Amino acid sequence: MIRKQARERREYLYRKSLELQESSLTEKRQQLKAALASGKPLSKELAEDKELQKDFIYDESEQTEIDDEYSALSGISEPKVLITTSRNPSVKLLQFSKEIKLMFPNSIKLNRGNYVITDLVATCQRVQISDLIILHEHRGIPTSLTISHFPHGPSIIFTLHNVKLRHDLPEIGNSSESYPHLVFENFTSELGKRVVKIMKHLFPPGVKKDSSRVITFINNDDFISVRHHMYVKTKDTVELSEVGPRFEMRLYELRLGLLDNKDSEVEWQLRRFIRTGNRKNYLG
């Protein structure tokens, strides 16, 4: 009987302590929500509370399969990519768009004509396009590449640098239509992994092991070098032949919506006019 009473008392005290801890944590959570709603700074006690830090992780939000815009495409279905240009393109931009089409298997090239963005997005939704790529230029030089994923985003904008077309490269090789192997190097941050996911889902899955085609994306100080090669195995070595095009990309903006939604949330944007704007590496 004495042992039973002692056990019951310990259990009661334990439950009581849990209730007190839970009520204290609930009160702190309410204080935290009130501070967030009003915009007031957190008290030192709330800011340093480890239990609350487990509940509210603001720097790296947890991603689930429901949040993943590419879960339907991942390794199952082939992407359907539409490539177009800005209106009234120059000869060089048209040629660049043709060479970009050769990089993405099963892609479609569309002459822009008088299409505005809203009509272009509506057309892509109607024919079940998975990704839309738009190339822009300034005075005949390709300057930006925009990718918008359907049906609900994201949309990503890269600036283009040092664009070399196939005829600008020495000893150019012949391009193949086989599915390419993809190489991504030095994309170690969460933003870098996000960029990799967007880029790799432009290419179809199911690459054969004996495919001799390789497309490489190498991040160096947030400039992504894009190279397109064919390789041939000899007795002792592997010989690479560049087939082009060759260019560098720099991430400018990442939005959560489609191109026609001007009010979509900006997930990330390059801001150069801050103290660390040109010194910090964001992709890796």
Curated annotation (Swiss-Prot):
Gene Ontology MF: a single term: single-stranded telomeric DNA binding
Primary role: Component of the U3 small nucleolar ribonucleoprotein. Required for the early cleavages at sites A0, A1 and A2 during 18S ribosomal pre-RNA processing.
GO cellular component: Mpp10 complex; small-subunit processome
SUPFAM superfamilies according to UniProt: Class II aaRS ABD-related
GO biological process: ribosomal small subunit biogenesis; rRNA processing
Quaternary data: Component of a heterotrimeric complex containing IMP3, IMP4 and MPP10.
Matches recorded under SMART domains: Brix
Residues in Brix domain copies: 79-260
Localization terms from the record: Nucleus, Nucleolus
Keywords: Nucleus, Ribonucleoprotein, Ribosome biogenesis, rRNA processing
Primary location recorded for the protein, binned into one broad class: nucleus
Protein name per UniProt: U3 small nucleolar ribonucleoprotein protein IMP4
